[in-house]
């Protein structure tokens, strides 16, 4: 029996053929921490008696959740990571001088390479599977173990093959592909599985869409999401100073999958996930008929804060205004994206329409700052989670959607179908 991409990546790192279900220890190619999780890892590192990082050039700290600091507590948290980075002369330390949300910034910097094994103390580390790497979120103490040893242990996950076929319709994107999958299988439908995304739809999907797709693999309970390297991947990597030599793997034709799911996208509409689970997806045509007033629209995050998302929003908002009773916040995922969006005129369009454009931050997504919801408010958001209280008040409501649905809803002041504007 052949192997899946995920099994092959582990086999290459372990030095022998491995299969799903095996417990293995292997070298890590990249360890990722942020301003929320890294201080805990640093404490565990120091408590262990360790003095040096096993692989300092394979450790990245990205201050992205509450930077610039929102209060004294977050400033002190950032200070812990900052001082540790300076103490160990970390090559890959990113703060206000080179800002970005970690799961957008690191691929942009060439620090994610096909064939890598990557861990991060953030659940959406699975985003990096879009580049043909194994990437998964772990706890802060797991991160500390990797910092000390350069290794970690894993149970090789069985794979679910998801085959998307057909052509995406108007205003249907990678976000809709993953919301539709989660709608079908639920938030635990891929528990500790590798979601391997394939099919002609994926072949024609741009990198931004692929990042969105893999980003939300965890919302189905998956250990990782992964897409095989192709010409789209290679084009994305072509101008990056890659940290390592890529090791490209493809699943064998006779690879063993726990399940195969086929999704025909030809008639797929934009999907909007109602509160309070990402699995509560409905077609936008249905939601748009419900006259659901919107208090806030948020476009950003590691899911949908990329250049194409800002371009989509600008296209819809050009010559229009955000509804009087609605506020709109746009948060580009990195400074590079922000600069390019400004260069192309997108930022002027958004501001003229009445949107607020902020620096890169995870703040709004987790209800930290820069977009907190008040009691009983309703938000259409391009983020990845809509749990109770996720973006603020426990009585608020979050509807997850793509950037076109979000922008159209900002203009209409209620949940709207962008195809009808």
From Swiss-Prot:
Its cofactor is [4Fe-4S] cluster. Keywords: 4Fe-4S, Amino-acid biosynthesis, Branched-chain amino acid biosynthesis, Iron, Iron-sulfur, Leucine biosynthesis, Lyase, Metal-binding. This is 3-isopropylmalate dehydratase large subunit. Binds 1 [4Fe-4S] cluster per subunit. It catalyses: (2R,3S)-3-isopropylmalate = (2S)-2-isopropylmalate. The keyword Nucleotide-binding does not apply. Catalyzes the isomerization between 2-isopropylmalate and 3-isopropylmalate, via the formation of 2-isopropylmaleate. Its EC number is 4.2.1.33. InterPro entries: Acnase/IPM_dHydase_lsu_aba_1/3, Acoase/IPM_deHydtase_lsu_aba, Aconitase_4Fe-4S_BS, Aconitase_4Fe-4S_dom, HAcnase/IPMdehydase_lsu_prok, Homoacnase/IPMdehydase_lsu, IPM_dehydratase_rel_enz, IPMI_cat. [4Fe-4S] cluster binds at residues 302, 362, 365. Pathway: Amino-acid biosynthesis; L-leucine biosynthesis; L-leucine from 3-methyl-2-oxobutanoate: step 2/4. GO terms for molecular function: 3-isopropylmalate dehydratase activity; 4 iron, 4 sulfur cluster binding; metal ion binding. The lineage of its organism: Bacteria, Pseudomonadati, Campylobacterota, Epsilonproteobacteria, Nautiliales. Signal peptide: none annotated.
